Design a protein with these regions (language model features):
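Catalytic cores of nucleotide-sugar-dependent glycosyltransferases that transfer UDP/GDP/TDP-activated
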Residues: 1-172
Length: 172
């Protein structure tokens, strides 16, 4: 990210394929000024797919030392688990629905990570895919600074972004 000059406030990760990103952001890169305020969210679509390999294999491609392969970090049942790492280190965790967020805290659906999901339940939220176009219509939405439509969104939508950045204390 520093190479391309892009410094997001939040990095949104999806599933085991991106599980190492929260690990790097929260721990490995945290001391660096560029990454120090960056947050991460990991979304779980299907807990069955966790990205599990033996520890040595993950160490080879990740560069992570033994420290990270403990039961409270990436280790799960003597293997390395990339999704578990993402869940442990992410600032927030989302799933595809409120129901799924509750289900994965139970042994039957938890795929061996139900205890971790219960431990992180304060950071876990279900978000249903899709949108309610009646309620979230930028032409009529009373909660945004500037209404817009398909004809003027390039000019008007940016005003909402600037207002939100200002409200959140971010650089405008």
């Amino acid at each position: 990210l520093p190479v391309i000059g892009f410094q997001p406030d939040v990095v949104h990760c999806h599933d085991w394929q991106t599980g190492l990103i929260p690990v790097y952001l929260k721990d490995r890169f945290r001391g660096g000024e560029f990454f120090c305020n960056m947050k991460s969210v990991i979304t779980i679509h299907n807990l069955k797919f966790q990205g599990v390999w033996d520890v040595k294999t993950i160490q080879r491609f990740s560069g992570l030392p033994n420290y990270y392969f403990a039961p409270d970090k990436l280790e799960a049942y003597k293997d390395g688990n990339l999704l578990k790492g993402g869940i442990v280190y992410a600032d927030a965790i989302t799933t595809v629905s409120d129901t799924y967020a509750e289900e994965i805290k139970m042994p039957f659906y938890g795929e061996g990570l139900d205890g971790l999901m219960r431990a992180r339940s304060n950071s876990l939220r279900g978000i249903v895919n899709g949108i309610d176009y009646e309620e979230f219509n930028p032409e009529t939405d009373k909660l945004i600074v500037q209404n817009y439509n398909v004809d003027n969104f390039r000019k008007e939508k940016v005003k909402n972004k600037r207002a939100l950045q200002s409200e959140l204390g971010l650089v405008v």
